[in-house]
Structures are given as C-alpha cells and as structure tokens.
Amino acid sequence: MNNNKKTAAIVSLYGNSNFGNKLQNYAVQEILKKEGLNTVNIVNIPCLNNKKVNNIEVLKLYIKGWLRYILKGDKIKDCVDPKDPKERKKNFLEFNKKIANSKHFFSFSRLQEFDKYDYYFVGSDQIWNPIYGGLSDLDLLTFTQKKKIAISASFGIEEIPLDYKGRVEQYISKFDAISVREEAAKNIIEKICLKNKFVNNRFALSLKRLKIILRSN
C-alpha cells in the first residue's frame, strides 16, 4: 500500500456464496484504485447483533418474505449449488485474493478503530436489509464523519419498518452521495427527503461524478 495516497474503505456483503456482491466488491475496488486511492475492504465477521436492531421486526419481515413466495406461487430456489460444493468454495476463496487488503471486523465495541480512512463506500447488494443484519452501525457508517458514498445499495424490502425509520433518516441523510440498485430503495430514500443525494438510481457511479465527490473536500 502506498502510504502517500488517500485510502478508501469498502463495506460490503462478503459471503462466499454470491457472485453478484463479490464482483461488485471487486469492481468498486478497481475503480477506486484507478482513481489513485488505496483500498481497504472491511470484512464483517458474524458477531452479536447490534442492540439497536429490533429482532421482532426482523422476524416479521422474514415471515412476510416467505408468505410472499407462497402467495405468488414462486418456487424457492435450492441454495445448494449443483456443482461440487468444495470446488465452489475453492473458487470463491481463490477470487478473494483479488479483493486485497481486507480488515476483519469482529465487534461493534471496537468500531471506532475503523475511523481512520479518508473515504467510505457502502454496497452493493442488500447491505441495508434488516433481515441480514443491515442497518447496523457498520453498514450505516455511524462511527465516522468522513465522506460516505453508497454504491448500488439495496434494502431488499419495499418499506422500512417504523422502528427503523428514524435510524435510516438520521444516518443515511449524512451520506455525501447515494446510488441504489432498485426503484424500491430509491422510493424509501426519497421519502426521507434525500432526492439531492442521488447520483443515479441503478448502477455504480460514473468516474466523472466520482471524481467530483472525492475532490470536494
């Protein structure tokens, strides 16, 4: 890592079972490197739930999602890959080598230790889905006052539960720029009067727009 360059931290879903978020993570990293930044990937290790997350509300969302599948008659896809699971895991771990300089996050009590980078990027995939533990202090970057940018982020739900709305408004309003993956996420954020935060509503930032955001400090 070049110590003379500024550093961008990337917070994303980091599981070894989803091609989409893995490729997005890599793409964001490479875009930032081309812009002359060092990159750090903050890997969220499963730990105790954030105390601010209401588990009852999460359970309601989970049940609602399954009911939607049943009522629509959708088939729930088999989560087991038809190929050899060992080979699949091996391929993911091999690709992880391309996502360099990872810092492992273990505990919310040590969150302030990560407030040492110049820029923070969140996304993609359902990084703000409360069912998956989203809307935590890490995912909302509550611990830093540095520049914050969301790239192709998603809530994975059509409406934020009442218990979460204040939290979403308080912290997402502090982002310098936001792009989201689908229309539902765009609607959620616009309801809290953040239309001026959008750079686009579907895909990653253009390089031109990214340069403007990074250099406006």
Feature-to-residue mapping (PLM):
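Terminal amphipathic helices with adjacent charged low-complexity linkers/tails
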Residues: 47-48, 197-200, 210
